[in-house]
């Protein structure tokens, strides 16, 4: 329902997508973006061809919601190919295949590395002005998108792949551009709050573990006397709760 819980809804016309807000559009991804394939490794060049060595992204670099830059490789390509396969800021990176949980996962390229290329198993989706890259990246992480990628993928033993044509045929629910931005901001705010609460909970657990270890250490080294210790009652009630005839 977007940000308005009372918004009018309509049937999206897509069984696995269900209803969407009435003012949203639902259309194939190709209406809002183009797809750029990547380069294939292992190509050799004649001595008279100008080449350059540049970094490139593999499937392992494209994680769910972020780019892992810890293991970026380089590749030698012709200067013409370098221009063709060079990533642009705002491209949405999506994996062609792998394990089912990796299928179609994506994130926005923010220009983290200059003149970076991408492998042929990594799609670069280039949205037009009607589609926010962040909105598309969020959609790829949704249950609806994962269902589509699974249904339209080619399955083999423990592996799956989705073609660029099936990818670009994916029905995309898209609100007006302003609402895309507002929804993204709201999701980021909520995600940050969840991260904060998670950190607080993890710190509390870590502190309790440390105190437990310290207590055990003190007990086994004779620093505290636990011979008369009794566990607290699992059920305690104020005196006012004890009525006549109740067990004492």
At which residue positions do the language-model features occur?
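Sequence-specific dsDNA recognition surfaces
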Residues: 13, 30-46, 60-92, 235, ...
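Amphipathic alpha-helical coiled-coil/heptad-repeat segments
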Residues: 1-5, 173-248
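A short glycine-rich beta-alpha junction/loop motif
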Residues: 115-123, 154-182
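Short, conserved charged micro-motifs
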Residues: 131-135, 178-181
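Non-catalytic DNA-recognition/assembly elements of restriction-modification systems
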Residues: 8-41, 169, 173-181, 185-196, ...
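Short, ligand-facing micro-motifs at secondary-structure edges
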Residues: 63-74, 92-118, 134-138, 147-152
